[in-house]
């Protein structure tokens, strides 16, 4: 068992992307990290690449499966002795017009994106309560704060997660457990680079005051801040890490282009 002086984070969806960036930042800050993902082979390769066997643990599990969640959380507790932070990052998306989304697709997205964080928190919170507190960060999305096309299931699941965050904060605060959410805007992940054409990226840039995509490490910085002592009086908040995307409203590309050309 690792020293109890080391803080421990459990990060879901940790095999790649924002989850991996958060796990990396925790390790850089001296934490031990249990990394959970449904992509077992990718996860194990990622964990092996750290070459930090004493500080890392790979947990293959589906966050929508109650039994798998309980088993994974118990394995993390046995390995490290405690869990100080939970990052509910695992998520999936279906991008289709509303009338084309099937019931099965709708249910699967909500199962992973909303029920998953519920199950993970139900499993981890008693451990945090018994050790005197902890921090939970749910990864929602700008799509949960403002409607958009082609993401009825995804956006609805993330809006629900934003409210779940506040509900958890209201009820778990008495145990010293803080619960917040990070709502990413467009992020320069490998997936985004694969599916966002130059035209799509230009459209996003026009609506983002900082005129660029966010970086995975910038999301990790926000996550780790909310899990740390400097955020000790912050709970029940949804922090948009989006370059101003949510604040800006509708872009006016023609006016902006004319101004730039003056």
PLM regions with names:
Residues 29-45:
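Conserved glycine-rich Rossmann-like NAD(P)H-binding loop of the short-chain dehydrogenase/reductase
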Residues 121, 157, 165:
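Active-site helix of classical SDR
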Residues 126, 170-171, 232:
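Alpha-helical segment proximal to the catalytic Tyr-Lys
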Residues 141:
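Residue(s) in the substrate-gating loop at a strand-loop-helix junction
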């Amino acid at each position: 068992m690792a020293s109890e002086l080391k803080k421990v984070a459990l990060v879901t969806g940790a095999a790649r992307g924002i989850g991996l960036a958060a796990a990396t930042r925790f390790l850089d800050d001296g934490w031990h990290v249990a990394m959970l993902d449904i992509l077992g082979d990718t996860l194990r390769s990622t964990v092996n690449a750290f070459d930090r066997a004493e500080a890392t643990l790979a947990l293959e599990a589906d966050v929508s499966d109650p039994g798998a969640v309980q088993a994974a959380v118990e394995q993390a507790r046995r390995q490290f002795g405690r869990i100080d932070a939970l990052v509910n990052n695992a998520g999936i998306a279906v991008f289709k017009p509303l009338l084309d989304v099937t019931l099965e697709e709708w249910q699967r997205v909500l199962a992973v994106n909303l029920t998953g964080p519920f199950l993970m928190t139900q499993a981890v919170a008693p451990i945090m309560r018994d050790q005197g507190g902890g921090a939970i960060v749910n990864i929602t999305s700008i799509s949960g704060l403002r409607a958009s096309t082609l993401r009825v299931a995804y956006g609805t699941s993330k809006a629900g997660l934003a409210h779940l965050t506040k509900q958890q904060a209201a009820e778990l605060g008495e145990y010293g457990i803080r619960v917040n959410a990070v709502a990413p805007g467009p992020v320069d992940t490998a997936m985004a680079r694969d599916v966002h054409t130059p035209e799509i990226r230009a459209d996003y840039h026009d609506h983002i005051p900082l005129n660029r995509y966010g970086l995975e490490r910038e999301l990790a910085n926000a996550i780790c801040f909310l899990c740390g002592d400097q955020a000790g009086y912050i709970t029940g908040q949804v922090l948009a890490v989006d370059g101003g995307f949510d604040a800006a409203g509708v872009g006016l590309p023609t006016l902006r282009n004319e101004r730039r050309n003056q």
